[in-house]
């Protein structure tokens, strides 16, 4: 199942990017994103925040001068620390956001706020240095997310993007057979930077 979901997420991102380039190039940008996660899991007494890596691709389509749609494809390390042991959950995520931009279209500096959903699948899990069987965890993870940031124009078609995001998991990270009433859901604060390149129509 996880392989099918993984293929679906990647295909959706690539299909969207291809359609954007072919039909909406003048309003579309795409590029790399990298950052850091500060994550934890709810209802685990004594758990502490875990620092992890996030990296991947980001794309934005400008619907109007003030609104847009952002779709990312990200490798995201989440989890928590308990008794000096880190439980790390590595996900492939497809964040989808509706963006609201401030200022004018041609401005060099444009603040933004956004909100959306984050479907993802579990790629692997580690408890300390030991790999943990994925069967102990929920393969599919959903979250709601919001954030703020700014886009800084570096040239006519290149932008530096800085983002601060919050993720709130909607489902238990554990497999259904291990759930006992109190939901253990991911919660993450993410700080990232990216470079977006404007596409031209074919």
Residue ranges of predicted features:
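Cleavable N-terminal export/targeting peptides
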Residues: 1-26, 200-202
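Outer-membrane beta-barrel proteins
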Residues: 18, 40, 63-65, 98-104, ...
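Short glycine/proline- and aromatic-enriched beta-strand/turn motifs that initiate or cap beta-hairpins
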Residues: 21-61, 196-202
